[in-house]
């Protein structure tokens, strides 16, 4: 670690570990159990504390706070941690809080994500890769977000909710139910509007397969009869469509939340 990369006003506790070419800007505060991997850059006024690891090439902007204790009354100073992957862009005023005993003790963020101004990632969240969270997205505790999802600005997600891969949530959406992979949801109360067809096309999914998957989803959520029976019928009918299979697998997993449905 070169001292020339550390601003003289930064406060770095003894015990903090830095990789190669780490840059720490003015007035940053780094705790004693923080690990910053190669090429991490802290612009200024960044606070990183707790048992926290930041992956290589991640850039963190002013007034972000990473690794502080979870905002829960039952937190008892357990030694939980925050793990953030590589190549993330974490903009101003983002908060990522440590895990808790009730959630596996780790808040985990993947790679190649963009978290815009004011994003909050609560305790014990499991955040995937290649995500975009727009300004002031707020995630409560224990939320799982799959790869390539996009969450629009000022949206809030209820604790324990799952957000499926490649889905898109429109801005200002309160999300209190699971969002299926590829789902497109928005509203004052998030409802399913179809599949994220534009995003799927951009990611190289076959257009015909995507449209077939949309038909399958409509049969599941808008068809007649028992919901569980419809899932089984659609699974058999579209068993050769990998997108449908991925959605069916998601629907069959255990969850404490309901699913976002089409507006009736």
Swiss-Prot record:
SUPFAM superfamilies: Trimeric LpxA-like enzymes (SSF51161). Gene3D superfamilies: Hexapeptide repeat proteins (2.160.10.10), Udp N-acetylglucosamine O-acyltransferase, C-terminal domain (1.20.1180.10). It is found in: Cytoplasm. Pathway: Glycolipid biosynthesis; lipid IV(A) biosynthesis; lipid IV(A) from (3R)-3-hydroxytetradecanoyl-[acyl-carrier-protein] and UDP-N-acetyl-alpha-D-glucosamine: step 1/6. InterPro entries: Acetyltransf_C (IPR029098), Acetyltransf_C_sf (IPR037157), Hexapep (IPR001451), Lipid_A_LpxA (IPR010137), Trimer_LpxA-like_sf (IPR011004). One of its GO terms (molecular function) is acyl-[acyl-carrier-protein]-UDP-N-acetylglucosamine O-acyltransferase activity. Pfam families: Acetyltransf_11, Hexapep. Its EC number is 2.3.1.129. Keywords: Acyltransferase, Cytoplasm, Lipid A biosynthesis, Lipid biosynthesis, Lipid metabolism, Repeat, Transferase. The keyword Acyltransferase applies. It catalyses: a (3R)-hydroxyacyl-[ACP] + UDP-N-acetyl-alpha-D-glucosamine = a UDP-3-O-[(3R)-3-hydroxyacyl]-N-acetyl-alpha-D-glucosamine + holo-[ACP]. One of its GO terms (biological process) is lipid A biosynthetic process. One of its GO terms (cellular component) is cytoplasm. It is an enzyme of class 2 (transferase). Involved in the biosynthesis of lipid A, a phosphorylated glycolipid that anchors the lipopolysaccharide to the outer membrane of the cell. Belongs to the transferase hexapeptide repeat family. LpxA subfamily. HAMAP family: LpxA. Homotrimer. This is Acyl-[acyl-carrier-protein]--UDP-N-acetylglucosamine O-acyltransferase. It comes from Rickettsia prowazekii (strain Madrid E). The gene is lpxA.
């Amino acid at each position: 670690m070169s001292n020339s990369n550390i601003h003289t006003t930064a406060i770095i506790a003894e015990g903090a570990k830095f990789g190669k070419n780490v840059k720490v800007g003015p007035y940053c505060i780094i705790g004693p159990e923080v690990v910053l991997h190669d090429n991490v850059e802290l612009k200024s006024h960044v606070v990183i504390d707790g048992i926290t690891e930041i992956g290589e090439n991640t850039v963190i902007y002013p007034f972000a706070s990473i690794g502080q204790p979870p905002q829960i009354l039952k937190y008892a100073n357990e030694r939980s941690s925050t793990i953030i992957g590589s190549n993330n862009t974490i903009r101003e005023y983002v908060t990522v809080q440590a895990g808790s005993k009730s959630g596996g003790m780790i808040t985990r963020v993947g790679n190649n994500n963009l978290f815009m101004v004011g994003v909050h990632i609560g305790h014990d969240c499991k955040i995937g890769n290649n995500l975009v969270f727009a300004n002031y997205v707020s995630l409560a505790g224990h939320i799982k977000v799959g790869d390539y999802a996009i969450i629009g600005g000022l949206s809030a997600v209820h604790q324990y909710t799952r957000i499926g891969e490649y889905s898109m949530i429109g801005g200002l959406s309160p999300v209190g139910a699971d969002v299926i992979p590829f789902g497109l949801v928005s509203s004052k109360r998030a409802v399913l509007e179809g599949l994220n067809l534009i995003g799927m096309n951009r990611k190289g999914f076959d257009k015909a397969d995507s449209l077939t998957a949309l038909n399958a989803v409509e049969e599941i959520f808008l068809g007649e009869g028992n919901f569980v029976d419809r899932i089984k019928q659609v699974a058999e009918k579209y068993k050769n469509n990998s997108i449908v299979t991925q959605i069916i697998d998601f629907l069959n997993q255990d969850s404490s939340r309901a699913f976002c449905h089409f507006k009736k």
